[in-house]
UniProtKB/Swiss-Prot annotation:
Coarse class of the protein's main subcellular location: membrane
Enzyme category, top tier: hydrolase
Gene designation per UniProt: lepA
Protein name per the record: Elongation factor 4
Gene Ontology terms: biological process: positive regulation of translation
GO MF term list: GTP binding; GTPase activity; ribosome binding; translation elongation factor activity
Native species: Bacillus cereus (strain AH187)
Keywords: Cell membrane, GTP-binding, Hydrolase, Membrane, Nucleotide-binding, Protein biosynthesis
Compartments, record wording: Cell membrane
Membrane topology: Peripheral membrane protein
Amino acid sequence: MNKEERAKRQSKIRNFSIIAHIDHGKSTLADRILEKTNALTQREMKAQLLDSMDLERERGITIKLNAVQLNYKAKDGEEYILHLIDTPGHVDFTYEVSRSLAACEGAILVVDAAQGIEAQTLANVYLALDNNLEILPVINKIDLPSADPERVRQEVEDVIGLDASEAVLASAKAGIGIEEILEQIVEKVPAPTGDSEEPLQCMIFDSLYDPYRGVIAYIRVVNGTVKVGDKVRMMATGKEFEVTEVGVFTPKTTQRDELTVGDVGFLAASIKNVGDTRVGDTITHAKRPAAEPLAGYRKLNPMVFCGLYPIDSARYNDLRDALEKLELNDSALEFEPETSQALGFGFRCGFLGLLHMEIIQERIEREFKIDLITTAPSVIYKVFLTNGEDMIVDNPSNMPDPQTIDRVEEPFVKAAIMVPNDYVGAVMEICQGKRGTFIDMQYLDETRVTLTYEIPLSEIVYDFFDQLKSNTKGYASFDYELIGYKPSKLVKMDILLNSEQVDALSFIVHRDSAYDRGKVIVEKLKELIPRQQFEVPIQATIGNKVVARSTIKAMRKNVLAKCYGGDISRKRKLLDKQKEGKKRMKSVGSVEVPQEAFMAVLKMDDN
């Protein structure tokens, strides 16, 4: 293409993404948009088409972002090229959203006509505003009997401050309003700015590993043009490669001769090493490089850590490969090797939240067929010692001796919880039980309230979300951001089985709830650990003080079965002999801890 053709094509490109709270219908809307623009034949169409992982389709949530190019003939008779970048809505996957938005000029904001605005709707809108996107409100599910589009329209104006007078009323399920949405995209979303003659700048917003073609980078071209055969350089790592193919997604990968300004597509360059392409990096030409890289997005820091260990220790290297491949596709995952006396060799992994942790675990078990044991999740604590030094602890078993600790600080989050009026009391109770501090309460309208609390992250990690949902019948929605560290009275609790410490069961807990927590765990382990041939004491200790104890009784054979008659000395001899044997066994016996016991420690309720 020459310069004029490229400029004309650029003016017809529209890049947009769809943002919404979970379950407000954005994957269905994406399906309808694909149908409307005839991206696929009827035969290829299936529900939640862009959710390509089995896991996504099963749970009905979007985890990965996805990109697709569509051709749309608008009412003005012109052909437009639309790039739809689908995004997840769950709070753990905000980084996926921020990456999608960095590649767009506009966003469709989907709001459920019955439920109205929810916490993550707001969080995603603020992300979109940070990226200066044009936001088009769409009120979805208007065919529901409980829909109240006018109230929701008012809410969008009051809470978010967007002009909702032209908001499209739609039902993705019934296919109502899809054309209006496409027309609004063409009219209101600006065409990409950039110059195809400038030095090349492409932003990598995702990548995946193909065993035949190496690493495939998903890119958005900001300036310049990239063709097959070009020599390109990754600006962060300085590595150079020759481009073997470029193309777009129509959802299938379709090869093209070149990608130019505004295009969203993929680039393969026989990149074998996973570490050479970093999401957020800029690709430029090796011969005529750009002066500086694009402003990538900030690296997200993991908030939750846990240990992953293969049940079969021979598969340690397979687990490393699995984590490396997932890291490529999931820029927020971090991991490093660690060892545990109880579990052998494994990895300490960092995640954005509990859902993220569960998803990674499931993906390893499904896609790589590795059975895992996971340890209790923990957050990063700052420990200040009496000798003036300080250290960072992300694994409870690294916590120093209590005598040497001056103070411990833990991360706090500011949680915004949106909830119907009737459940305000229930939510406040949960937050107080989780050591939360009340900050603020605002009424959105007659029926809904936003509560703001400061809560320690470690309390949210356990089961905060589950409790919130079950005590508000699923109506509460919640979003959080890190605000920093504050001192807390924290202690490390160890679990001893048969007087031996099991390092994988250690956890850090607030001093006030230590006793109750210890008692619950000890009882729980008593149920879950199978009975042995000798009796096994289970103790919860803080330092050298035992705070709770329970005993698993020994299994024993009835040694008196063959005695008839009543001679007590004969029976006594047999019983004493048995007791002696049990005692010997106890001194050498070791106790196997089943995986359920580790899981129970995770899922433990404080009540």
